[in-house]
Swiss-Prot record:
It is an enzyme of class 2 (transferase). It is found in: Cytoplasm. The gene is dapD. This is 2,3,4,5-tetrahydropyridine-2,6-dicarboxylate N-succinyltransferase. Its EC number is 2.3.1.117.
Length: 271
């Protein structure tokens, strides 16, 4: 994989020197090999190592090169035709059952996204570079953006959106860690991290500029929701007191033992 990384990095530095028609065969093959590694889960855009998330920038480079070098083409989706650069993930009748993933009609997964066994897709959309781990449910009309990392046993409720982050290359993707619940119509975007075991209420919107207020500590932070947080939508007064600004409010933090004994609705109502 080291050789592949070197080829991709060098190609990205010279990406303006070739087009769909002129891309060298060696680079074309390296791009496709990288996309295949992402597609089968051997390579991830981001990995947690020693408690820290690290981004594989070269894998992002490969995706951007894939967009640049692939021609638009028509392909058959069974009930209709699409015209795009990136094919769908499941292209034959044998690959889907072998994957161990349940895919309800009208769910869309692009090539280069990985779904672990025992995941369930209701009619939803999973973009290239995304990683969805085992036991996770992607509910109706939920979207998982490019390169987003979704942990084990996560529930993305109806209409929830997890934003994609391809550029800048060094930016972390949006990350939802294991055992999280993301409420209906909530949006987690711009590389925000929701740590393990957190519960996000319906209609919570969190980007890098969204204040995250911890009711217990009275601290305001940005870009990260700590493990075990129970979060609801709210607002904070402006500095001049003339208006209120939308905020995500951490009403409490719970451990796994508490969460296992208490329903999600109870946790949110107690806030």
């Amino acid at each position: 994989m080291t050789d592949l990384k070197t080829i991709i990095e060098e190609a990205y530095q010279n990406k303006d020197n070739f087009t769909t028609d002129t891309v060298p065969k060696k680079i074309h093959q390296a791009i496709h090999q990288t996309i295949e590694l992402l597609d089968n889960g051997e390579l991830r855009i981001a990995e947690k190592q020693n408690g820290q998330w690290n981004t594989n920038e070269w894998a992002k480079m490969a995706i951007l090169l894939y967009f640049k070098t692939e021609p638009l083409k028509t392909f058959d989706a069974g009930y209709t035709f699409f015209y795009d650069k990136i094919p769908l993930k499941y292209t034959n009748n044998t690959s889907q059952p072998q994957s161990g993933v349940r895919v309800v009609p009208h769910a869309i997964v692009r090539k280069g996204a990985y779904l672990a066994p025992n995941t369930v897709l209701m009619p939803s959309y999973i973009n290239i570079g995304a990683y969805v781990d085992s036991g996770t449910l992607i509910d109706t009309w939920a979207t998982v953006g490019s390169c987003a990392q979704i942990g084990k046993n996560v529930h993305l409720s109806g209409g929830a959106g997890i934003g994609g982050v391809l550029e800048p290359l060094q930016a972390h993707p949006t990350i939802i860690e294991d055992d999280c619940f993301i409420g209906a119509r909530s949006e987690i975007v711009e590389g925000v991290m929701v740590e393990k075991g957190s519960v996000i209420s319906m209609g919570v919107f969190v980007g890098q500029s969204t204040p995250i207020y911890n009711r217990q500590t009275q601290e305001i932070t940005y870009g990260r929701i700590p493990a075990g947080s129970v979060v609801i939508p709210g607002s904070l007064p402006s500095k001049d007191g003339h208006y209120n600004r939308y905020s995500a409010i951490i009403v409490k933090q719970v451990d796994e033992k508490t969460r296992s004994k208490v329903s999600l609705n109870e946790l949110l109502r107690e806030g």
